[in-house]
């Protein structure tokens, strides 16, 4: 059995790419929605079509402001008599307050903070399915965006990270036991630094880095979380207009850099202000990289840029 001792972020990142890692995610938020109108309210408040969701199905969706700015990216899991929403770290209060502000007098729905009641793990890497199946029988047979519940644990096959990706949710008292089971099944224990390296390599927008009210979902490359055939929702007009005209002011892009830079730094293409750096890291085999929102005309791969005195080039996402 592997020990519970972590190694180092680079070794953990390499383990994810070669096999599987288990990473604590309990600092991300969990909101339980109950009541007759739980899905109806989420439907009229967010970008994806949630009306036809079956029990056992999960979908990504974005809460947006009337100006189509991002409030948060949610996983919405249909558990039949209730719904579980997974939020970004530190966003539970914001999400609950935002949703509560649009409840009409005859709506039957309540949003409860389940973050302390439930714990969360992430399993990533090409062997994540085998590890998940050793923990909860049947997990490996799940298709993407589906989940099952067994013996008090919920297992969701979500977006692949380093080859595959599962989210495990269980009671706070049970989650450490499940982590130990994952390690016993061959997963390497990893931490937040390794997760950030993995999601950076994948080009995922995340939390307070890219998922803020400065940006619109399409600019964040969140097209799979947006339905263009559903009815009205908060911010829908602006998003539909951007899609129909095919004109985005900016786009989340990758940068290969000669050195590390600070998040929030300006990106310039010659004398032109091109955009803003939102995430920075060093990836094995690639060196310093960054995510940045760039003006669309300057977001073409191969475009030379500078961040302060550091040179770089725009590249396609994902990095790996």
Task: Tell me what each language-model feature is.
Residues 1-71:
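Acidic, proline/glycine-enriched N-terminal capping motif
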Residues 9-18, 61-73, 104-107, 147-156, ...:
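Short amphipathic beta-strand starts and helix->beta connectors
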Residues 35, 85, 123-125, 168, ...:
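Residue-level signal for inorganic ion chemistry
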Residues 55-58, 138-148, 203, 208, ...:
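Glycine-centered loop/turn motifs
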């Amino acid at each position: 059995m592997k020990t519970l001792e972590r190694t180092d972020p680079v070794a953990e990142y390499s383990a994810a790419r070669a096999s599987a890692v288990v990473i604590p995610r309990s600092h991300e938020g969990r909101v339980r929605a109950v009541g007759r109108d739980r899905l109806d309210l989420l439907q009229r408040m967010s970008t994806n079509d949630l009306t036809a969701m079956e029990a056992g199905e999960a979908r990504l969706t974005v809460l947006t402001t009337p100006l189509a700015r991002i409030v948060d990216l949610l996983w919405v899991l249909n558990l039949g008599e209730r719904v579980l929403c997974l939020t970004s770290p530190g966003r539970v209060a914001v999400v609950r307050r935002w949703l509560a502000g649009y409840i009409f007098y005859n709506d039957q729905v309540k949003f409860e903070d389940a973050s302390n009641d439930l714990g969360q793990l992430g399993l990533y890497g090409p062997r994540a399915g085998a590890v998940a199946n050793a923990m909860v029988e049947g997990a490996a047979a799940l298709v993407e965006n589906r989940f099952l519940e067994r013996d008090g644990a919920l297992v969701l096959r979500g977006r692949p990270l380093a080859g595959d990706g599962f989210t495990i949710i269980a009671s706070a008292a049970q989650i450490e036991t499940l982590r130990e089971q994952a390690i016993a099944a061959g997963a390497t224990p990893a931490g937040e630094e390794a997760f950030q390296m993995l999601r950076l390599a994948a080009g995922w927008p995340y939390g307070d880095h890219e998922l803020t009210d400065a940006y619109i979902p399409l600019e964040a490359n969140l097209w799979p979380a947006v339905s263009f055939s559903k009815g009205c929702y908060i911010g829908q007009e602006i998003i539909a207009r951007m899609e129909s005209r095919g004109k985005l002011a900016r786009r989340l892009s990758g940068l290969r850099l000669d050195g590390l830079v600070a998040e929030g730094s300006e990106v310039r293409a010659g004398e032109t202000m091109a955009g803003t750096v939102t995430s920075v890291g060093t990836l094995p085999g690639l060196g310093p990289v960054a995510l940045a929102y760039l003006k669309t005309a300057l977001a073409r791969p191969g475009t030379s840029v500078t961040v302060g005195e550091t040179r770089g080039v725009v590249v396609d996402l994902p990095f790996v």
